[in-house]
Amino acid sequence: MSLHISPMSPSFGAKITGVDLKKAVDDDVRHQLQKTLSEYAVLVFPKQFLEPADIVRSGEIFGNLMPQQLKKYILPDFPMVGYNSTKDLPLKDGKLQVRGENYHTDHSNSVCPPRATALSAVKIPATGGDTQFVDVRQAFDDLSNELKEKVIKMRSLHVHESSRSPRMFTKLSEEDLAQIPEVIQPLVIRHPMTGRAALYLNTGRMEGIEGMNLDEGFALINSLYEHATSPQYEYRHQWTEGDFVIWDNRSVMHQANADYNPEEFRYLYRIMIEGDALQAFSQ
Protein backbone atom coordinates (compact mmCIF):
# COMPACT_ATOMS: atom_id res chain seq x y z
CA MET A 1 0.00 0.00 0.00
CA SER A 2 1.55 3.30 -1.13
CA LEU A 3 0.12 6.24 0.78
CA HIS A 4 0.23 9.59 -1.02
CA ILE A 5 -0.34 12.92 0.78
CA SER A 6 -1.26 16.02 -1.27
CA PRO A 7 -1.58 19.31 0.69
CA MET A 8 -4.75 21.23 -0.20
CA SER A 9 -4.02 24.68 1.26
CA PRO A 10 -0.96 26.57 2.53
CA SER A 11 -1.43 25.76 6.21
CA PHE A 12 -3.66 22.69 6.52
CA GLY A 13 -5.73 20.01 4.81
CA ALA A 14 -4.47 17.07 2.73
CA LYS A 15 -5.90 14.67 0.17
CA ILE A 16 -4.97 11.05 0.88
CA THR A 17 -4.74 8.52 -1.93
CA GLY A 18 -3.22 5.07 -2.22
CA VAL A 19 -5.28 3.61 0.62
CA ASP A 20 -8.49 1.57 0.40
CA LEU A 21 -10.53 2.14 3.57
CA LYS A 22 -12.80 -0.78 2.71
CA LYS A 23 -9.87 -2.97 3.82
CA ALA A 24 -8.01 -3.11 7.12
CA VAL A 25 -4.75 -1.13 7.23
CA ASP A 26 -1.53 -2.30 8.84
CA ASP A 27 0.08 -0.62 11.86
CA ASP A 28 2.53 1.41 9.77
CA VAL A 29 -0.28 2.97 7.74
CA ARG A 30 -2.35 3.49 10.89
CA HIS A 31 0.46 5.40 12.60
CA GLN A 32 1.17 7.43 9.48
CA LEU A 33 -2.49 8.43 9.14
CA GLN A 34 -2.70 9.40 12.81
CA LYS A 35 0.40 11.56 12.47
CA THR A 36 -0.88 13.09 9.22
CA LEU A 37 -4.21 14.03 10.80
CA SER A 38 -2.42 15.76 13.68
CA GLU A 39 -0.24 17.69 11.22
CA TYR A 40 -2.76 18.59 8.50
CA ALA A 41 -5.95 18.67 10.66
CA VAL A 42 -8.28 17.78 7.75
CA LEU A 43 -7.85 14.64 5.64
CA VAL A 44 -9.87 13.92 2.49
CA PHE A 45 -10.04 10.34 1.19
CA PRO A 46 -11.77 10.48 -2.22
CA LYS A 47 -13.71 7.70 -3.95
CA GLN A 48 -14.03 5.41 -0.92
CA PHE A 49 -17.82 4.69 -1.05
CA LEU A 50 -17.87 3.26 2.46
CA GLU A 51 -20.59 1.15 4.03
CA PRO A 52 -21.34 1.60 7.76
CA ALA A 53 -19.06 -1.28 8.81
CA ASP A 54 -16.25 0.27 6.74
CA ILE A 55 -16.82 3.63 8.42
CA VAL A 56 -16.56 2.09 11.88
CA ARG A 57 -13.30 0.37 10.96
CA SER A 58 -11.93 3.53 9.30
CA GLY A 59 -12.75 5.65 12.34
CA GLU A 60 -11.00 3.16 14.61
CA ILE A 61 -7.76 3.88 12.75
CA PHE A 62 -7.76 7.15 14.70
CA GLY A 63 -9.11 5.97 18.07
CA ASN A 64 -12.17 4.64 19.85
CA LEU A 65 -15.52 5.78 18.51
CA MET A 66 -17.61 8.16 20.61
CA PRO A 67 -21.40 7.77 20.93
CA GLN A 68 -23.59 10.16 18.95
CA GLN A 69 -25.52 12.63 21.11
CA LEU A 70 -28.58 12.85 18.86
CA LYS A 71 -29.88 9.31 19.29
CA LYS A 72 -32.72 9.70 16.79
CA TYR A 73 -30.17 10.14 13.99
CA ILE A 74 -28.18 6.92 14.44
CA LEU A 75 -28.16 3.65 12.48
CA PRO A 76 -29.93 0.90 14.47
CA ASP A 77 -27.41 -1.75 13.45
CA PHE A 78 -24.41 0.58 13.96
CA PRO A 79 -25.17 2.73 17.02
CA MET A 80 -21.86 4.62 16.83
CA VAL A 81 -22.71 5.82 13.30
CA GLY A 82 -24.99 8.81 12.86
CA TYR A 83 -26.31 10.36 9.69
CA ASN A 84 -27.14 13.78 8.25
CA SER A 85 -30.15 13.71 5.94
CA THR A 86 -32.16 16.43 4.25
CA LYS A 87 -35.29 14.41 5.06
CA ASP A 88 -34.86 15.34 8.73
CA LEU A 89 -34.31 19.08 8.23
CA PRO A 90 -37.10 21.66 8.60
CA LEU A 91 -37.77 24.32 5.97
CA LYS A 92 -38.14 28.02 6.73
CA ASP A 93 -38.90 30.50 3.93
CA GLY A 94 -37.88 27.86 1.39
CA LYS A 95 -34.46 27.25 3.00
CA LEU A 96 -33.32 24.17 4.88
CA GLN A 97 -32.52 24.77 8.55
CA VAL A 98 -29.18 23.00 8.80
CA ARG A 99 -27.53 22.16 12.11
CA GLY A 100 -24.03 23.53 12.36
CA GLU A 101 -24.46 26.46 9.96
CA ASN A 102 -21.90 28.51 11.89
CA TYR A 103 -18.22 27.82 12.58
CA HIS A 104 -17.82 25.62 15.65
CA THR A 105 -15.98 22.67 17.15
CA ASP A 106 -18.03 19.63 18.10
CA HIS A 107 -19.38 19.12 21.65
CA SER A 108 -17.11 21.69 23.27
CA ASN A 109 -19.30 21.52 26.38
CA SER A 110 -18.11 17.95 27.03
CA VAL A 111 -15.41 17.29 29.62
CA CYS A 112 -13.64 15.25 26.94
CA PRO A 113 -14.72 16.61 23.54
CA PRO A 114 -14.25 14.40 20.47
CA ARG A 115 -10.72 14.59 19.14
CA ALA A 116 -12.02 14.15 15.60
CA THR A 117 -15.20 13.99 13.55
CA ALA A 118 -15.67 12.31 10.17
CA LEU A 119 -18.30 12.38 7.44
CA SER A 120 -18.77 9.93 4.58
CA ALA A 121 -20.71 11.20 1.57
CA VAL A 122 -23.44 8.89 0.26
CA LYS A 123 -25.66 11.28 -1.71
CA ILE A 124 -24.71 14.85 -2.61
CA PRO A 125 -26.74 17.61 -4.34
CA ALA A 126 -25.62 18.94 -7.71
CA THR A 127 -24.37 22.20 -6.19
CA GLY A 128 -23.90 23.58 -2.70
CA GLY A 129 -23.74 21.87 0.68
CA ASP A 130 -19.99 22.41 1.07
CA THR A 131 -18.30 22.10 4.46
CA GLN A 132 -15.89 24.88 5.41
CA PHE A 133 -12.94 24.56 7.77
CA VAL A 134 -10.69 27.19 9.36
CA ASP A 135 -7.26 26.65 10.91
CA VAL A 136 -7.44 27.97 14.49
CA ARG A 137 -3.75 27.11 15.02
CA GLN A 138 -2.62 29.55 12.36
CA ALA A 139 -5.21 32.05 13.56
CA PHE A 140 -3.59 32.01 17.00
CA ASP A 141 -0.08 32.24 15.53
CA ASP A 142 -1.09 35.41 13.67
CA LEU A 143 -2.36 37.28 16.75
CA SER A 144 -0.23 40.12 18.04
CA ASN A 145 2.09 39.23 20.92
CA GLU A 146 0.08 41.54 23.15
CA LEU A 147 -3.19 39.76 22.38
CA LYS A 148 -1.57 36.33 22.75
CA GLU A 149 -0.42 37.27 26.25
CA LYS A 150 -3.91 38.52 27.06
CA VAL A 151 -5.85 35.42 25.99
CA ILE A 152 -3.42 32.58 26.67
CA LYS A 153 -4.54 32.05 30.28
CA MET A 154 -8.24 32.82 29.78
CA ARG A 155 -11.05 30.31 30.18
CA SER A 156 -14.69 30.17 29.09
CA LEU A 157 -17.81 28.32 30.26
CA HIS A 158 -19.21 26.06 27.53
CA VAL A 159 -22.92 25.15 27.81
CA HIS A 160 -25.45 23.32 25.63
CA GLU A 161 -26.62 26.57 24.02
CA SER A 162 -25.15 30.01 24.65
CA SER A 163 -27.54 32.81 25.59
CA ARG A 164 -26.14 34.63 22.54
CA SER A 165 -25.82 31.67 20.19
CA PRO A 166 -25.86 32.69 16.50
CA ARG A 167 -26.94 29.23 15.31
CA MET A 168 -29.84 26.83 15.69
CA PHE A 169 -29.68 23.98 18.18
CA THR A 170 -31.94 20.97 18.46
CA LYS A 171 -34.54 21.73 21.12
CA LEU A 172 -34.27 19.41 24.10
CA SER A 173 -36.56 18.59 26.98
CA GLU A 174 -35.71 19.84 30.48
CA GLU A 175 -34.89 16.25 31.42
CA ASP A 176 -32.45 15.87 28.51
CA LEU A 177 -30.90 19.28 29.19
CA ALA A 178 -30.22 18.26 32.77
CA GLN A 179 -28.07 15.38 31.47
CA ILE A 180 -25.91 17.59 29.25
CA PRO A 181 -22.70 18.84 30.87
CA GLU A 182 -21.35 22.34 31.25
CA VAL A 183 -17.60 22.73 31.46
CA ILE A 184 -14.96 25.43 31.67
CA GLN A 185 -12.49 25.16 28.77
CA PRO A 186 -9.22 26.99 28.01
CA LEU A 187 -9.44 29.73 25.40
CA VAL A 188 -6.08 28.59 24.01
CA ILE A 189 -5.33 24.86 23.96
CA ARG A 190 -2.21 22.76 23.34
CA HIS A 191 -2.43 19.92 20.83
CA PRO A 192 -1.32 16.73 22.61
CA MET A 193 0.56 15.35 19.60
CA THR A 194 2.12 18.41 17.97
CA GLY A 195 2.31 20.82 20.91
CA ARG A 196 0.86 23.63 18.78
CA ALA A 197 -1.36 26.30 20.28
CA ALA A 198 -4.87 26.83 18.93
CA LEU A 199 -7.81 29.07 19.72
CA TYR A 200 -10.69 27.08 21.17
CA LEU A 201 -13.90 28.80 20.09
CA ASN A 202 -17.55 27.87 19.76
CA THR A 203 -19.86 30.89 19.71
CA GLY A 204 -22.89 28.62 19.93
CA ARG A 205 -21.83 27.25 23.32
CA MET A 206 -19.51 29.81 24.97
CA GLU A 207 -21.07 31.75 27.82
CA GLY A 208 -18.60 34.60 28.22
CA ILE A 209 -15.05 34.69 29.60
CA GLU A 210 -14.05 34.02 33.20
CA GLY A 211 -13.24 37.24 35.06
CA MET A 212 -14.93 39.54 32.51
CA ASN A 213 -18.47 40.86 32.49
CA LEU A 214 -20.70 39.23 29.88
CA ASP A 215 -20.61 42.08 27.37
CA GLU A 216 -16.82 42.36 27.49
CA GLY A 217 -16.41 38.59 27.35
CA PHE A 218 -18.69 38.17 24.35
CA ALA A 219 -16.99 41.12 22.62
CA LEU A 220 -13.62 39.36 22.95
CA ILE A 221 -15.08 36.03 21.80
CA ASN A 222 -16.66 37.67 18.76
CA SER A 223 -13.45 39.52 17.90
CA LEU A 224 -11.39 36.31 18.05
CA TYR A 225 -14.06 34.45 16.07
CA GLU A 226 -14.09 37.11 13.34
CA HIS A 227 -10.31 36.89 13.11
CA ALA A 228 -10.21 33.07 13.08
CA THR A 229 -12.85 32.79 10.35
CA SER A 230 -11.07 35.13 7.94
CA PRO A 231 -10.76 33.71 4.39
CA GLN A 232 -6.97 33.21 4.66
CA TYR A 233 -7.54 30.46 7.23
CA GLU A 234 -10.20 28.58 5.24
CA TYR A 235 -10.39 25.36 3.29
CA ARG A 236 -13.78 24.79 1.66
CA HIS A 237 -14.59 21.18 0.83
CA GLN A 238 -16.85 20.59 -2.16
CA TRP A 239 -18.30 17.14 -1.59
CA THR A 240 -18.22 14.31 -4.11
CA GLU A 241 -20.07 11.07 -3.47
CA GLY A 242 -17.67 8.55 -1.96
CA ASP A 243 -15.61 11.14 -0.05
CA PHE A 244 -14.53 10.26 3.48
CA VAL A 245 -13.38 13.37 5.36
CA ILE A 246 -12.01 13.43 8.90
CA TRP A 247 -10.94 16.50 10.86
CA ASP A 248 -9.20 17.28 14.14
CA ASN A 249 -11.51 19.27 16.41
CA ARG A 250 -8.52 20.58 18.37
CA SER A 251 -7.03 22.29 15.31
CA VAL A 252 -9.94 23.47 13.14
CA MET A 253 -13.48 24.76 13.33
CA HIS A 254 -16.02 23.75 10.69
CA GLN A 255 -19.41 24.85 9.42
CA ALA A 256 -22.17 23.44 7.24
CA ASN A 257 -23.97 25.26 4.42
CA ALA A 258 -27.65 25.15 3.47
CA ASP A 259 -27.13 26.73 0.05
CA TYR A 260 -28.51 23.81 -1.99
CA ASN A 261 -31.86 22.91 -3.50
CA PRO A 262 -34.01 21.57 -0.62
CA GLU A 263 -35.69 19.19 -3.05
CA GLU A 264 -32.36 17.42 -3.68
CA PHE A 265 -31.37 14.58 -1.38
CA ARG A 266 -28.19 14.95 0.71
CA TYR A 267 -27.09 12.10 2.97
CA LEU A 268 -23.83 11.57 4.86
CA TYR A 269 -22.74 9.15 7.58
CA ARG A 270 -21.10 10.69 10.67
CA ILE A 271 -18.79 9.35 13.36
CA MET A 272 -16.77 10.91 16.18
CA ILE A 273 -13.50 9.79 17.78
CA GLU A 274 -13.10 9.90 21.56
CA GLY A 275 -10.88 12.64 22.94
CA ASP A 276 -9.26 13.54 26.25
CA ALA A 277 -9.74 16.57 28.47
CA LEU A 278 -8.30 19.66 26.80
CA GLN A 279 -4.93 20.99 27.90
CA ALA A 280 -4.44 24.72 28.33
CA PHE A 281 -1.46 26.01 26.35
CA SER A 282 -0.39 27.98 29.43
CA GLN A 283 0.13 24.80 31.47
Name what the model sees in each region:
Residues 2-244, 249-283:
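Non-heme Fe(II) oxygenase catalytic core, chiefly the N-lobe of the double-stranded beta-helix
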